[in-house]
Swiss-Prot record:
Highest classification ranks of the organism: Bacteria, Pseudomonadati, Pseudomonadota, Alphaproteobacteria, Hyphomicrobiales
Family according to the record: Belongs to the cytidylate kinase family. Type 1 subfamily.
E.C. designation(s): 2.7.4.25
Listed name of the protein: Cytidylate kinase
Pfam families on file: Cytidylate_kin
């Protein structure tokens, strides 16, 4: 079973995907961390984030063992990843990696921006997670402060809105709800309620398939 979870930054899709994977005994891939890894490498080397050729080279030589690097979770790297992810050659370089991950038995949960529309268009379950931008900014602020990082909520909100704009309007694989995806508004749900709502969607889809 492949579960595709898409949505904008800080919508809660990552936590939801991780919990769903644990619940169903599936592997989990936060596809955003792949782009964060590329962005981090470019930032560390002092390279231009919009240098598509160099970024694609980095994308083709990623080491999955580094994906849990805490530095990838910084606000700076997240913003840089939004820029890098708009580069067509980078997305092309990472497409095979993501599809191969999803295809391994018994299945996987992938979360990102284009899982249900591009990476795994035939996923059994697709969920599109949304939340009010102000609520997303507040959550991201609390996350940053919990890590001991300074965080300006107004600046984070402005960045989230800018990222939404880039993600939704990029030429390749823009952020959008797949036609057959279930919409889950996570604005006023705590973690447990959000996960429960996602599990309910998965179970409803599975029950529907069993009846066919």
């Amino acid at each position: 079973m492949i579960i595709a979870i898409d949505g904008p930054a800080a919508s809660g899709k990552g936590t939801m995907a991780k919990r769903l994977a644990a619940h169903y005994g599936l592997r989990h891939l936060d596809t955003g961390v792949i782009y964060r890894a590329v962005a981090h490498a470019l930032l560390t080397a002092g390279l231009d984030l919009k240098d598509e050729a160099r970024a694609a080279e980095v994308a083709m030589t990623l080491d999955p063992s580094t994906f849990d690097n805490p530095a990838f979770r910084s606000h700076e790297v997240g913003s840089a990843a939004s820029v890098v992810s708009a580069l067509p050659k980078v997305r092309e370089a990472l497409l095979a990696f993501q599809r191969q991950f999803a295809s391994q038995p018994p299945g996987a949960v992938l979360d990102g921006r284009d899982i249900g529309t591009v990476i795994c268009p035939d996923a059994e379950v697709k969920i599109y997670v949304v939340a009010d931008p102000k609520i997303r900014a507040h959550r991201r602020t609390l996350e940053a402060r919990s890590r001991g990082e300074p965080a300006d909520e107004a600046a984070i909100l402005a960045d989230i809105l800018a990222r939404d704009e880039r993600d939704q309007n990029r030429a390749v694989a823009p952020l959008k709800q797949a036609a057959d995806a279930y919409l889950l508004d996570n604005s006023h749900l705590d973690i447990e309620s959000g996960v429960r709502a996602a599990i309910d969607i998965v179970e409803a889809v599975r029950a529907g398939r069993q009846r066919v």
